[in-house]
Amino acid sequence: MYIKSFSAKSNDFKKMWYCIDATGKILGRLATNIASRLRGKHKVEYTPHVDIGDYLIVINAKNIKVTGKKCTDKFYYHHTGYVGGLKKIAFKDMLHRYPERIIEIAVRGMLPKGPLGRSMFKKLKVYANDNHNHSAQNPKILNI
């Protein structure tokens, strides 16, 4: 007699849609909760090699908070690919120009690297204000 262990498959689970309001939330604490839900760690059937996480809509990204002096001292770096092409932008400037990217960068760093992490990241939708175009999915409000 063989006792088979349970192996989750991505298609066996219904993925829910949730909406999170980022107003007044701390960036790191919010990002860890988002990454955990994208991976599916809140579910009993969690399996590390299967994408069973839910879809998340984050609204009001422009109202995110950070602690300490990170608003002025935190920088985001990227390289253009040319010699001397290292660019940096301060957190406060990034918050005014691209508020969605702040949450996306924080969450992407907490997800697995590789194809599985990329598929998990595609389930995250971030918006600077409270308007989103996913009302057809009937997202549930998630308080974090």
UniProtKB/Swiss-Prot annotation:
CDD domains recorded: Ribosomal_L13
InterPro entries assigned to the protein according to its UniProt record, in alphabetical order: Ribosomal_uL13, Ribosomal_uL13_bac-type, Ribosomal_uL13_CS, Ribosomal_uL13_sf
Keywords: Ribonucleoprotein, Ribosomal protein
SUPFAM superfamilies reported for this sequence: Ribosomal protein L13
GO cellular component term of the entry, any: cytosolic large ribosomal subunit
One of the protein's GO biological processes: negative regulation of translation
Domain of life of the organism encoding this protein: Bacteria
Keyword Ribonucleoprotein assigned: yes
GO molecular-function term, one example from the UniProt record: mRNA binding
Family indicated by similarity: Belongs to the universal ribosomal protein uL13 family.
Annotated function: This protein is one of the early assembly proteins of the 50S ribosomal subunit, although it is not seen to bind rRNA by itself. It is important during the early stages of 50S assembly.
NCBIfam families: rplM_bact
Subunit relationships: Part of the 50S ribosomal subunit.
Protein name: Large ribosomal subunit protein uL13
Gene name of the record: rplM
